[in-house]
Amino acid sequence: EAGEECDCGTPENPCCDAATCKLRPGAQCADGLCCDQCRFMKKGTVCRVARGDWNDDTCTGQSADCPRNGLYG
């Protein structure tokens, strides 16, 4: 929702302050295929294994999202 940096529905999330819906100090992310222990995963880390003729999707190192690369192998 507007103004939220993370989903504050789960108080046990170590990356997100459940009271403010803001990332905790030092956290880059709270969830996502490219988020590990509150930090963005390294660029090139496989976040979605290829199916068929497609290449693996990899993290950018700048976001918790796992972008589709859309390239054939």
Curated annotation (Swiss-Prot):
- Localisation: Secreted
What cellular-component terms does GO give this entry? extracellular region; plasma membrane
* Disulfide pairings: C6-C21, C8-C16, C15-C38, C29-C35, C34-C59, C47-C66
- Give the location of motif Cell attachment site in residue numbers: 51-53
Summed up, the tissue specificity of this protein is: Expressed by the venom gland.
> Pfam families from the entry?
Disintegrin
What assembly does the database describe for this protein?
Monomer (disintegrin).
PANTHER family noted in UniProt = ADAM A DISINTEGRIN AND METALLOPROTEASE DOMAIN, DISINTEGRIN AND METALLOPROTEINASE DOMAIN-CONTAINING PROTEIN 28
- Function description: Inhibits fibrinogen interaction with platelets. Acts by binding to alpha-IIb/beta-3 (ITGA2B/ITGB3) on the platelet surface and inhibits aggregation induced by ADP, thrombin, platelet-activating factor and collagen.
Q: What is this protein called?
A: Disintegrin cerastin
Task: Specify the species.
Answer: Crotalus cerastes cerastes (Mojave desert sidewinder)
